[in-house]
Amino acid sequence: MASRKLLLLPGDGIGPEAMAEVRKVIAFLNSDLNLGFETEEGLVGGCAYDAHGQAISDADMEKALAADAVLFGAVGGPKWDSVPYEVRPEAGLLRLRKDMQLYANLRPAICYPALAHSSSLKPEVIEGLDILILRELTGGVYFGEPKEIIDLGNGQKRGIDTQVYDTYEIERIADVAFELARTRRNKVTSMEKRNVMKSGVLWNQVVTARHKEKHADVQLEHMLADAGGMQLVRWPKQFDVILTDNLFGDLLSDVAAMLTGSLGMLPSASLGAADSKTGKRKALYEPVHGSAPDIAGKGIANPIAMIASLAMCLRYSFGLVAEADRLEAAIAGVLDDGIRTADIWSEGNTKVGTTEMGDAILAKFKALSA
């Protein structure tokens, strides 16, 4: 059996509660489906700072590099607001992304049928929505140099950020986009601002060339990023995979997430380069929601995003597509049954806590796996 090593990093706030529900699913995958997952655990974020004075220890970083995939909960909270900037809880996630060389961020936007009414858009606009935004994660304006504020000496200051992309950075993220599209509806929409940005001109040129060279079987269209934002709200179901840079991906993925009306229920994945020998990519999976310290420890957190992150892990790190499909179907089925945590509850549904929601999803998953 192939190695299936998972590192669990529950983190802070509601992270440990949500991760506890994922552990139940992994236990079933091993006991009943004999999939042989090996799990280790570590500390990240504020709890790691409390234990080690770092947002993630070197030892846990080594575990992450040795694992086939990392499942990450959430980090941060007011308890650590005054810690030094370089060891703030969020620095743990940034180090994971940097040391694991995770350059491709996958943000799905899925509308569960039972929650179509929760969107601010008309149900017919978002019913059946299933799009994937692929954001380049390690380049662009967030990392480009120079990045500084200059005192001009005349009472004025100048803020400088630099948008930089090299050909190889665009090629590798484009390859991921086309590969993902082949497993979906075979369409990529590349978004940039080539009309006003030289980096956008290069992005367009490189994606076009890469498509012609290696991925001509996939449909490709180009769209200016501002027009893309408008089209996401106008008719989002026209899209399959949206490929874009770090800045526009940051903006567009949050727009797409809110189309569903359930930002706190969505998973994400960050992938690195494929190993030349095994073809495996380093990968980290995490819910889009934060640590929600205001409800931590109360047993009311919604574990769906964390469980959906495990489904993404099964799909993209281990090729267990059927199992991922069933787990996602189990989530949808529980919502169809009217079971809700407090954050998505409405009159006429059944309000449950974290554990009850996790148990309901697991029961549905078991039934679908029988």
Swiss-Prot record:
Q: In which pathway does it act?
A: Amino-acid biosynthesis; L-leucine biosynthesis; L-leucine from 3-methyl-2-oxobutanoate: step 3/4
UniProt-annotated location(s): Cytoplasm
Which EC class is this protein assigned? oxidoreductase
What InterPro entries does its record include? IsoCit/isopropylmalate_DH_CS, IsoPropMal-DH-like_dom, Isopropylmalate_DH
User: What is written in the cofactor note of this entry?
Assistant: Binds 1 Mg(2+) or Mn(2+) ion per subunit.
The main location class comes to: cytoplasm
- Cofactor dependency: Mg(2+); Mn(2+)
Name the residues annotated as site: Important for catalysis: Y142, K193
Example GO BP: L-leucine biosynthetic process
Q: Which reaction does it catalyse?
A: (2R,3S)-3-isopropylmalate + NAD(+) = 4-methyl-2-oxopentanoate + CO2 + NADH
Please name one Pfam family that this protein belongs to.
Iso_dh
**Binding sites annotated in the UniProt record for substrate:** R97, R107, R135, D226
Which GO cellular component terms are attached? cytosol
Look up the EC number in the record and give it: 1.1.1.85
Task of the protein:
Catalyzes the oxidation of 3-carboxy-2-hydroxy-4-methylpentanoate (3-isopropylmalate) to 3-carboxy-4-methyl-2-oxopentanoate. The product decarboxylates to 4-methyl-2 oxopentanoate.
Record-stated family: Belongs to the isocitrate and isopropylmalate dehydrogenases family. LeuB type 1 subfamily.
Q: What is this protein called?
A: 3-isopropylmalate dehydrogenase
Q: Which organism is it from?
A: Brucella suis biovar 1 (strain 1330)
